[in-house]
């Protein structure tokens, strides 16, 4: 049993039941509901002719599982921040397997690629509207989605696409917003803003129930993946993607932000290492879902892990017959995928990258190889990511 703050008009006019977006709420027919702490305050300020009433309501078990909220009446907002070829699509699909979640795949793509310096304010505004289920108000967003269907942004939200396709409403703004409001976890995945810019949302949009997951991958693995066709075709146009100096410098800057957030907002920020998820899918996922408020891995997510971390999907086999590995599938033999660069890259190339990326490697707990034998072995030499970050932050 829980409580919500509602506002009852002193006048006799009734408020439409359609304005109440709380399933299972009782006796709310004549009430206007104020959802969210910021909205409560504004609602109270603007409705001097209203009186406040506390109403009991029942919460379904999925919502009750979600803890650590600053605003118990609103959905949880999860922002996954990373870079190209870090496993972010896989982690995004993992997150959308969680019950009662709505997933946005790369909502910032329509701004630019990557988001340029002058667009950070606009990017944060877009994310705010995405999280508040108001994408219909983002100028140019739906038009871009319809025009660029080949990017499959909406199609990557599997549950949404399955439902909207039956009603031919996938690009209808009102439909998207209404669908979004039915869910208690809104997830957005992006590789198009820096971590230092993403965390500003904590300050600029305090009304959100925001948790940020920073997904890191060994930069040697990311860089190796970016050299392969067809990724290399678009990656070469972006210095952050193709130039190790730019990329590893950005990772070093991210670590400064990681130190700040780990100290100031540990309940709202998590570093997730792709290698940990790949080598220990269930153990790492357990830690991830607990961060999001679940007591254990939900059955739907267990099914996802069983089908996406130990098999090669049919779509990948199709590409292999053409002599090309499919780079965008999230069906992986995860333990092989995470470490394949150790067999594919020359030791000379690895040594050069280790010099360029030493700060990032150390801060994230990735081992630097000094011999060909250790590089080619199947032994995991990496250290615990939390221990590595604590050691890095204490010395910087």
What are these regions (language model features)?
Residues 1-78, 84, 151-161, 227-230, ...:
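PAPS-dependent sulfotransferases, especially Golgi type II membrane carbohydrate sulfotransferases
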Residues 83-89:
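A short, glycine-centered helix-capping/turn motif at helix boundaries
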Residues 89-100:
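A conserved segment at the C-terminal end of the G1
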Residues 101, 113-116, 204-206, 265, ...:
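Cytochrome P450
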Residues 104-195, 233-236:
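PAPS-dependent sulfation machinery
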Residues 161, 166-167, 172-302, 309-329:
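PAPS-dependent sulfotransferase catalytic domain
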